[in-house]
Swiss-Prot record:
Species: Exiguobacterium sibiricum (strain DSM 17290 / CCUG 55495 / CIP 109462 / JCM 13490 / 255-15)
Cellular component GO terms held in the UniProt record: cytosolic large ribosomal subunit
Signal peptide residues on this chain, from the entry's feature table: none
NCBIfam families (alphabetical): rplV_bact (TIGR01044)
Gene3D superfamilies with a match to the protein in the record: Ribosomal protein L22/L17
Protein name: Large ribosomal subunit protein uL22
SUPFAM superfamilies: Ribosomal protein L22
Function text: This protein binds specifically to 23S rRNA; its binding is stimulated by other ribosomal proteins, e.g. L4, L17, and L20. It is important during the early stages of 50S assembly. It makes multiple contacts with different domains of the 23S rRNA in the assembled 50S subunit and ribosome.
Similarity remark: Belongs to the universal ribosomal protein uL22 family.
GO biological process: translation
Subunit structure and binding partners: Part of the 50S ribosomal subunit.
Gene label: rplV
PROSITE patterns in the cross-refs: RIBOSOMAL_L22 (PS00464)
Keywords, ordered alphabetically: Ribonucleoprotein, Ribosomal protein, RNA-binding, rRNA-binding
Length: 110
């Protein structure tokens, strides 16, 4: 049985979020949470929140045992990009891309 959780339209670049998600893929829940507790990245609180949501879904919706849960899938997809402009010298403007991410985590019993 699998339990899923996701966060869509999160305002962080997918490349940065993938660095954190790659650390917890395939790990047991306790180990994944301890890794996230000591990871100093901007995406860590977002990934931790999604992981805790997947754990809560597994416990509440499917009556799974938390001690046996493993992160089976963890991936980040690219969301829509917000385009902004920054004024530059001589009346020009340059574009700034504010990227968004969709974070997905799937946990299951081993």
């Amino acid at each position: 049985m699998q339990s899923k959780a996701s966060a869509n339209m999160v305002r962080i670049a997918p490349r940065k979020a993938r660095l954190v998600v790659d650390l917890i893929r395939g790990k047991q829940i306790g180990e994944a949470l301890s890794i996230l507790a000591y990871t100093n990245k901007a995406a860590t609180p977002i990934v931790e929140k999604v992981l805790k949501s997947a754990i809560a879904n597994a416990e509440h919706n499917f009556d799974m045992n938390i001690e046996n849960l493993v992160v089976t899938e963890a991936y980040v997809n690219e969301g829509p990009t917000l385009k902004r402009f920054r004024p530059r010298a001589m009346g020009r403007a340059s574009r700034i891309n504010k990227r968004t991410s969709h974070v997905h985590i799937v946990v299951s019993e081993k």
